[in-house]
Amino acid sequence: MKNPSKRILAFIFAGFIGVTVRAQNLDVIGVTVLRMATTNLNGAGIRVAQPEANNGDNGSTNSWEVNPNNVAQPVVLFAYTSGLGASTSYPNSVGDWSSHADAVGNNFYGLPNGVATNVAHVDNYEGNYFFDSIISATPPPNINDPVVNQSFIFGSVPSQVTIAQQQQIDSDYDNYAAKYNTLFISGAGNSGPASGSVCPPATCYNGIGVGAYGTSASSVGPTEDNGRAKPDITAGGSPADLTSFSTPYVSGAAAVLMQAGLRGDGGDDTNSAADIRTVKALLLNGAVKPADWTNNPPSPLDPRYGAGVLNVFNSYKQLAGGQHGCIVSTTVSTGGAHPPTGAAGTVGVLSGWDFNTNTSGKLPLQFDAVNHYYFNVTNSVSNSTFTATLTLVWNRQQGQTSINDLNLFLYNCANSNLVACSTSLVDNVEYIFVPKLPQGRYDLQVWKAGGLDIVSASETYALAWEYFSELLKAAKSGPNISISWPVYPDGFILQAVTNLAPPAAWYTNNPAPVVTNNQNVVQLSATNANQFFRLWRP
């Protein structure tokens, strides 16, 4: 997050290499290919908010405002609010200009290299006013901004913020999110690499905590209060790899997905498609795993990367796969076994989502409940394997200090063996990643605990899934060789080598792919020497 010792350095980067780095970041996070494959997905119709901490520019003690000219947007797009009042003009008397706010805005909605360049409105708030007068107010007012970017922190836990204070901050944000369907996307902080360094408000249950990819400075989970998995996701940053500047990329992606959901790209149930639980599940499920990604079960996510590196194109394609309900719902005694049922139905797509409710028993009958999603994971290549990514998200309910216990299970239907599961007792995200899944029929289960101690009998959740097998093809094209692979899923790089004998020296200096008919295509000159190719996700 914002660090006074980095302020001048960030300004220099912004002035000299920021544009180039931002354009490269759009490639990495899937924005470039999304714009090639879709029409007008740019955040249109979505209102957003950007509360900012004082940056101290020009010696001001009230420096938090975006300068519209510096993000290439009109003044009419903005409203500015602080304890000194509100204004729709710029400059104004309620605050002063902030270079930090400009850098955040450029990644969020700025032209030309922001993610959501056509948002409907930006509410720019002074950070203390935003928390004191909106988030923690009684009752809190509805700002009507479904996406809120927060590139600030309250401080490190427990050295600057006590665990009790962190929990109160989390509750204030979670209550607001549950009440108004507002997605708070917050930087995790730059206190890494020590574990437990994620700072509020990125620690709240119902929001998304964002790390910075490519730096050891990014804060690392789990949370200090009860060991929850945070951050949820990462992205690169510009003008520096700090979470202040990675966070607005995720916020922009959320605005784009909400726009897509509301315009019907994910099906007729537009309210479910744009719900914050669905958007969060899709963002996490579309993330690309770094080579050293790992989690430590029962924690669902990597303590450094969360679900991985943001890729909004992958998330969009899963949204576009449509909403598909469970095949069958069953109940079992509390703590009882819940193998596949043998139901004949099948979810019709290997990439998609659902927004549903699971109801277990509390009183007078106590029982666990399971929603079953059956998939036939196959293709035309008999020996190929699949990569499965599965994400379950639900809210901490308004006014509650705890959460309902939901889990994810993946069973092989042929033998009822458990393939993988995610069973955290403290997280409201469950996550399964299986990189080499054999072909077959599988039962993906959303399980909800019953019993006397549950928060409520029913819980609404969002589920996103992706099963893919990346097929690399080669064909002769005149005097050349054409190498191709599907545009979706994104995040792969073509590598080549002339000799497979270890240690094989794979290289990546191939021509950039050209997208043709939803395929990445690379044209190479034919040679008499052996050449071997593979797809690699860095």
Regions found by a protein language model. Give the residues of each.
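Bacterial N-terminal signal peptides that target proteins for export
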Residues: 1-9
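Bacterial N-terminal signal peptides
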Residues: 10-18
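Subtilisin-like serine protease catalytic core
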Residues: 23-133, 141-148, 156-161, 178-183, ...
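Acidic glycine-/aspartate-rich tracts in secreted/extracellular proteins
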Residues: 53-58, 113, 191-192, 214-215, ...
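C-terminal edge strands of extracellular/lumenal beta-sandwich accessory domains
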Residues: 275, 280, 371-375, 409-415, ...
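Secreted peptidase-domain scaffold signal
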Residues: 301-404, 462-469
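Surface-exposed beta-strand/loop patches in noncatalytic accessory domains
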Residues: 401-428, 507
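Short, composition-biased motifs enriched in small/polar/acidic residues
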Residues: 469-538
